[in-house]
Amino acid sequence: MLLLFDHSTPAPLSSYLVGHIVIEARTRGWDRLSNGDLLVEAERAGFEVLVTADKNMRYQPNLKGRKIAIVVLGTPRWPALQMHVDLVAAAVNAAAPGSYTEVEIPKR
């Protein structure tokens, strides 16, 4: 799948998402777009999954009917995520068009 990491997603996570193509929003100049505009541009560009740690994404209007899946990380902190990359990978692998998934990261 073609994945888009927004500005809040730790880049090292990409190496654990085997079999996927990962692009960071900043490389497209999209790191300053609003959530709604980011979703529009990502869909237009053919991205299948947006990976973000922005929990406000759930409040975006019109999430229904979107083609892009959204996976929201429980934390943007790489040390915490690194211990639970299997949870993130499972959520990404299970993502379906238009789905919204929050990945809770257990506290130590």
Regions found by a protein language model. Give the residues of each.
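N-terminal first-folded block
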Residues: 1-48
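Short loop/helix-cap segments at secondary-structure boundaries that form the rim of catalytic
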Residues: 13-19, 57-65
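Acidic, metal-binding active-site segment of PIN/NYN-like and related structure-specific nucleases
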Residues: 42-62
